[in-house]
Amino acid sequence: MAKGFTVKAKNPKPKKAAAAPQYDYAKAKEMIKGKTVVFCLPGRGVSYTFLKSFVSLCFDLVQSGASIQISQDYSSMVNFARCKCLGANVLRGPDQLPWDGKLNYDYQLWIDSDIVFSVEKFYQILLMEKDIAAGWYCTEDGKTTSVAHWLEEDDFRTNGGVMNHETIESISKRKKPFTAVSYTHLTLPTIYSV
């Protein structure tokens, strides 16, 4: 200790009892043991923030006894990139199996290159125990989301695919569910070249 200084410290305050964990991560790690996760990563590049999150998740999954595979591809058209990640080809039509049914896996995990996530978020989704689970995020304004729903089919034909982007408030007030529409359900105009 330096000459001439006196250290004064208060008695340490007793620690509060830790709150019970909201998620059972031990259960999630047991659930993933022996399973195969295919990471579907559409896009061309990622940030170091994404890379750190991704590598942390990969290490944690392998340490928990899971196998991982990576399917990554790029196209300037995002729907093509997603098809390519599944080993599909949009020119072969709608009735295709992921990777033509040749890849054995238990889970597909789609992560866009601009998403920041944690290992805990993966396990929270796994603990939902649903066939399909998803999350979404707000844009920079903190109110608008990337979630969009199509207008009625007639509006789609008239306006050429205008969507209503949802806000947190509009989602909370929504009375009807989002509608899933097969892409073969819509009739697209014929394009003629000259």
Language-model features, listed with the residues they occupy:
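Single conserved hydrophobic/aromatic residue that forms the stacking wall/gate
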Residues: H185-V194
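N-proximal low-complexity "stem/linker" segments adjacent to membrane-targeting elements
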Residues: K3-Q72
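Short beta-strand-to-loop acidic/aromatic patch adjacent to the donor-nucleotide binding site
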Residues: Q96-V116
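Conserved donor-nucleotide/metal-binding helix-loop-beta segment in metal-dependent transferases, i.e.
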Residues: E120-E140
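Short beta-strand-to-loop element that shapes/binds the nucleotide-sugar donor at the catalytic cleft/hinge
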Residues: A134-E152
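Short, conserved alpha-helix that lines the donor NDP-sugar binding/gating region
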Residues: V78-G101
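Short, flexible, basic/aromatic active-site loop/helix in glycosyltransferases
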Residues: E153-S182
